[in-house]
């Protein structure tokens, strides 16, 4: 019965998960799904949770600490003490054997400690905030990288499908040409070479189409992997390449690339400077005194038998209130060396921040230049494709009118195929360069 109930509940969970799993995703939905299920993001979020626990751990060291201890002893053989026999009327120089205490004893104690002052504790509280900020920065950086990756992969899947449509269109056109040319050849109106040229083009198109179809499957699997989608489950992408790559919207001017204060790497570097500054404070605080207060309460029970659980067992109590003050006096220049080392680390962090700012500024301007170049190249390749299609159509007419040879037609067709490939690559380049620039400036519209 229990087994049947377990299987029933398991089946319900599986069905519920299947119902919640979408079978189609737009780009925004894919990004949202990836931000919720990507493994890198999940682990980055766990780092934030760890930082929060570390913060509370540090706070807890400044709060009262209470501990208890129970110590039970049973002497299998009682210790013997020697005392001068003359104390008991014996001869001088002789010793009497005495046994003190009972065979069994139990001591229970309760201790409370409270930190009064510790410079390192105060610095530690500040450090936990910085540590949490760094974890949040790394989480945001992971989010940005995953968004960029999902956008690129989603676009790659659509572009792969777009390229397949080109190849299928080319294949259909070649097959029609082959049938027509082959019929002309059989009737003696065309040379065998013309048939062979078409066969050669068809073979190349078929090979390219097979490769493109395999590449599409790989891109789909990569997208599923990144967004945390089951690999064995079919996934339909609802957006078309025209939905993502809209010229009027996609080529909107971005803000000044020199506006880099939102860059996540710079913010991480700034927090690193804060972290190293706190480490310097920590080393300096080690020269300050540490003050702790404590309160001990102890109860002792003695007996020759194990009677400690009896209600009439007698317990002897003692209490102690104290203050512990630890004052560093001389460390043989050890603290000084640690402080100087922390200063060097702080200067390194400041230099690294300056380097990061300069590098990001250069990268942002370079990315903007690449993006603008990609836009110009897109328009060039778009026009080249239009011209290549017209040229191919004209030469196809010329070929069937006997004005050009099959070799010339094949060269024109190869030119068209190259223009199609270049156009697809140009779209991909614009998308890739824009998302790279948006990531650098932290301006993604998918936020």
Regions found by a protein language model. Name each.
Residues 42-46, 59, 100, 116-143, ...:
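Sec/SRP-type N-terminal targeting helices
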Residues 20-22, 69-110, 240-248, 294-327:
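Small/polar, glycine/serine/threonine/aspartate-rich low-complexity segments that form flexible
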Residues 25, 29, 53, 139, ...:
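Periplasmic alpha-helical coiled-coil/stalk elements that build and connect Gram-negative outer-membrane
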